[in-house]
Each structure stands twice: as structure tokens, then as C-alpha cells.
A protein has these predicted regions:
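Periplasmic alpha-helical coiled-coil/stalk elements that build and connect Gram-negative outer-membrane
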Residues: 2-7, 157-275, 433, 437, ...
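Membrane-embedded beta-strand positions in outer-membrane beta-barrel channels/transporters
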Residues: 120-122, 166, 273, 385-387, ...
């Protein structure tokens, strides 16, 4: 009795460990709506794999963050294009001066309260800057394209994670059905043993062994149910649904074909890698970032070139102390006396003559306070300026920027190479895992077929009193364990094959 329970519990623990370890693909952490909108409610009806993927793509926070990052890069690109345009700024001030102050228009000291305004418009256009503006646009454009590929990568990762969680849930459901059938078989066996015990055909220990086996099978159902609940919760959280939706969450369970136990799974790894490298967004994003880093080198080298800018401004102003001359009429002509020197005495004093000269007519003016718009129009000043800056010595900033840009290119090139290497290794690992799962399925299938016959023979011998309960339970538990291995190997192969199909550009479907 003790031996049976120990072996049964050991196999149950091993089965649970295998169940937990199946489909050990990286799963995204549950997305929560902390500080944001509440999680979306789950729709009614069973979920299909495609429906789950579509819903996750629409509600996943990582995908949203990738989209926002791309929008930010697009805004940066737009701004860099606008940098080619001239700048234009308007300025205006209003000032009150009290006491003895300089009149801002006459530049004379005056002891009065003066209100003044200054208005200006400045514009600047960069004519040449070592092609830095254009290289900035090209670099930002590449960064934006890479961020779009990041969105696709986030969507692909999420789709694979949803497919993994979906298959994990289907696996748990099938294990529950398998264990429930064992419970039904054990219940029938207990009933038969009770009849045989009353007839005196078997000992009471056989009934106790049958009841022990029934309890063990029921425990396996509970374990499988708990695993199913965990798998369902993982999928619900991955979809960013509220945790309370797990109680009513159901998935569509299609009839999945068993792996071919005869023909080995074959795949052209080189062709699969080339297809994946040409289609997967993470590879393209890495290549775009290498190109962006190269543009960064050109951008940094542009700091060696002179900078030529065109600057223009228009200024004007108003002062409350400003005045304007107003014509009040013509004055009488001025009479100018005429003096004459004595030619015999050149050094003598000139004498007044009887002649006179009429001078020019002088206009009479008076000064009145000047109006605001009159002063604004009269005080306009204009400036046009070319500015040339030639870098000579700036603390090795340009040289350092170039060195950093070169290093950044090397870093991004290594990342691109690492991305391709990781992709190749992932394909090779998925292929090896798929082959191993197929072989495990074939072995488990043969084992189930053999143990099914062995368990039937053991059941006949047990019912006839020719086999004790311990040996019968061992035979039954061996079959249960083999059936669990077969189911897990089946779903492991299906997932690995779907991953490889995905690398070949095929959609995720069951």
C-alpha cells in the first residue's frame, strides 16, 4: 500500500513538472492598466486563436508604447525638416521710466515719466552648415523607419506569446479529459472490486488498493485543473483582460492532428533563415539603425565645416516724449546789411553801405507730441547681416563627436550581427526541439499502445484474483504517465512547428 502511494505521488509530481515545463517559450509579463484606463471586458463566447491575437494586439500596452515611440520619432523627423526653413521671431516691449532718464529716441536726459515701446522682427536662415541639417533629416528618417519595425516586432512577439499561452491552455484541457477518463475507469474498478469482494473472489486489500488508486486519479484531476486555471489566467492577463474574466473565459478547441510518428520532420534551415532574415522586422530594424549610425558619422563630421548664416531684422519704437515739427506759416524776409572795405586800407574796418540784401524766407515751426503710429513709421530701422563662423579650436568637441559616432556605428553593426546570429540559433533550436518532440511523441505513442494492452491484461488478472492491487495500480499508473507524455509531446511539437512556420512567413493558425 505504501509503495503504491509513493510511486503514484512521485509520478504525479513528475507529470506536473513536465506540464509546467512544456512550451517554455518566453511569455510576456501580464499587462496592467496602472494609472491608465481599466482593462477591457472579455467578450462572450469561446475565443479562437486568431481572435485572441487580434484582441491582444489592440489592447497590449507594450504595443501601444512602441506606437508612441514611433510617433515621437516622426515628430522629431518633422522638426528636422522644418529646420531648413528660416526662423522668424517677433518681439515687443513696453517700458515706463520715472525720474531723470535717457529718452530712448533722443538719447537725452529728461526728468519726466517716459513710456516707450520697442518692436522688432528677426529672421535667420542657415545657408551652409556642413550638410548637417540634411544629414540630420536622413538620420531621423532612418530612426523613424526603425521604430516602425519595432512596432511589428512587438506585435510578432505578442502573437507568439498568445499562441504559446493558447496551446498551453489546450494542453491543460486535454490533460484534464485524460485524467477524468482515468477517474471514471477507477470508479468502475472500485465498483467491480466491491462486487468481487462480496462474492469472495478477491481479498479486502484489493478493494483498498482500488480505492487508493481512485483517490490518486482524483488528485491528478485536481492538479490538472489547477494547471488549467493557471494557464487560463496567464492567457487572460496576456490579453489585458480583467482577472475576474478568467472564471468564464473559454477557448475554441479545434481538433489538432497528431504528429506523424513515422516520417521525420524535415526543414531546410538555410532557406528558413534567409526567409526570416528578409521578413522579420527586428532584422530590418537593426540594419536601419546601422545606416542611421553612418549618417550620424556624416553629421558629426559636418562640425569641421564653416557655418554661414543670413540674418535680417526690422526694428522700430515709440516714446511718449517724442515730438514732431508742425509748420505754422512763413516769416518776413530777412534784411541783411552790406559792408564795404576801403581798398586803400585793406586792413581797416569795413564800413556800412547804403545797400541791403534780402535773405531767404524762413518757415516757422512748432513742436507737438508725435502720435504712436507716426513714430512707428518714422523710427523704422533695417539690418541685413551675413555671419560666417569658422571652427578652429573648440575643446576637441567635433573630433570627440566623430569618434563617438564611429563607435556608435560599430555598436549598431554588432547588434545587427547579433540579431542575425540569435535568429539563426533560434531557428536551429526550434528545429531540434521539434524533432525531439516528434520523436518523444512517437516513443510515447508506442509506449501507450503497449501499456494499454498490459493494463488490460493486468485488469483481467486483478479481477480474477491472480494479481494483487499494488501491481495492478503500477500498470495503470504507467499507462497514465505514458499518456500524459504523449499529450505533452504532441503540443510541444505543434508549437515548435508553428514557430518554424512563422519564421517561414506563414500566419499563426491552428
Amino acid at each position: 500500500m505504501k509503495t503504491t502511494n509513493k510511486r503514484t505521488s512521485g509520478r504525479a509530481a513528475l507529470a506536473g513538472a513536465l506540464l509546467a515545463g512544456l512550451l517554455a517559450a518566453p511569455r510576456a509579463q501580464a499587462q496592467t492598466a496602472l494609472g491608465g484606463a481599466p482593462a477591457a471586458a472579455a467578450p462572450t463566447g469561446p475565443w479562437t486563436l486568431q481572435g485572441a491575437i487580434d484582441y491582444a494586439l489592440a489592447h497590449n500596452l507594450n504595443v501601444r508604447q512602441s506606437q508612441l515611440s514611433a510617433q515621437n520619432n516622426k515628430a522629431v523627423l518633422t522638426q528636422s525638416k522644418a529646420a531648413l526653413l528660416p526662423t522668424l521671431n517677433l518681439n515687443g516691449t513696453q517700458t515706463w521710466n520715472y525720474g531723470r532718464n535717457v529718452n530712448p529716441l533722443t538719447y537725452e536726459y529728461e526728468n519726466q515719466t517716459i513710456r516707450s515701446n520697442n518692436f522688432s522682427a528677426q529672421s535667420q536662415l542657415v545657408l551652409f552648415q556642413g550638410f548637417q541639417l540634411r544629414n540630420t533629416i536622413k538620420r531621423n528618417d532612418l530612426d523613424y523607419e526603425a521604430s516602425l519595425r519595432d512596432i511589428d516586432k512587438a506585435r510578432n512577439d505578442l502573437s507568439l506569446n498568445v499562441a504559446s499561452a493558447y496551446l498551453q491552455l489546450l494542453l491543460s484541457e486535454e490533460l484534464i479529459k485524460s485524467n477524468q477518463s482515468r477517474v471514471a475507469s477507477s470508479q468502475a474498478q472500485v465498483a467491480r472490486t466491491q462486487i468481487l469482494l462480496k462474492a469472495g473472489s478477491v481479498a479486502e486489500s484489493n478493494l483498498l488498493d482500488s480505492q487508493s488508486q481512485l483517490a490518486s486519479d482524483e488528485s491528478n484531476v485536481i492538479t490538472a485543473t489547477n494547471q488549467r486555471d493557471i494557464a487560463r489566467l496567464n492567457l487572460v492577463q496576456l490579453l489585458n483582460l480583467d482577472g475576474s474574466a478568467a472564471a468564464t473565459f473559454r477557448v475554441d478547441a479545434p481538433q489538432l492532428a497528431d504528429p506523424d510518428a513515422e516520417a521525420p520532420y524535415a526543414l531546410d534551415l538555410n532557406q528558413t533563415f534567409e526567409t526570416a532574415a528578409n521578413t522579420l522586422p527586428e532584422i530590418k530594424a537593426a540594419e536601419l539603425r546601422v545606416q542611421s549610425a553612418r549618417r550620424g558619422i556624416d553629421l558629426a563630421r559636418g562640425g569641421y565645416y564653416p557655418r554661414l548664416s543670413l540674418f535680417g531684422s526690422v526694428v522700430t519704437g515709440f516714446s511718449s516724449s517724442g515730438t514732431s515739427r508742425v509748420l505754422t506759416g512763413d516769416s518776413t524776409a530777412t534784411i541783411l546789411p552790406v559792408y564795404q572795405y576801403d581798398p586803400l586800407n585793406p586792413g581797416g574796418t569795413p564800413t556800412l553801405t547804403n545797400f541791403a540784401v534780402v535773405g531767404p524766407t524762413q518757415a516757422n515751426y512748432k513742436f507737438l507730441p508725435a502720435g504712436f503710429f507716426d513714430q512707428i513709421g518714422d523710427n523704422v530701422g533695417r539690418t541685413v547681416q551675413f555671419a560666417l563662423t569658422i571652427p578652429v579650436l573648440n575643446g576637441l568637441q567635433v573630433r570627440t563627436n566623430v569618434q563617438r559616432a564611429l563607435i556608435n556605428e560599430d555598436v549598431n553593426r554588432l547588434r545587427a550581427e547579433q540579431a542575425r546570429l540569435t535568429l539563426r540559433q533560434s531557428i536551429e533550436q526550434a528545429y531540434v526541439d521539434a524533432r525531439a518532440a516528434q520523436q518523444q511523441y512517437a516513443a510515447a505513442k508506442r509506449q501507450v499502445e503497449a501499456l494499454t494492452l498490459s493494463q488490460r491484461n493486468a485488469e483481467i488478472r486483478f479481477n480474477n484474483g491472480l494479481l494483487n492491487g499494488t501491481d495492478y495500480n503500477i500498470a495503470k499508473n504507467n499507462l497514465t504517465f505514458a499518456e500524459s507524455n504523449r499529450i505533452q509531446a504532441k503540443y510541444s511539437f505543434i508549437f515548435r512547428r508553428k514557430v518554424l512556420d512563422f519564421y517561414q512567413g506563414k500566419p499563426l493558425s491552428l
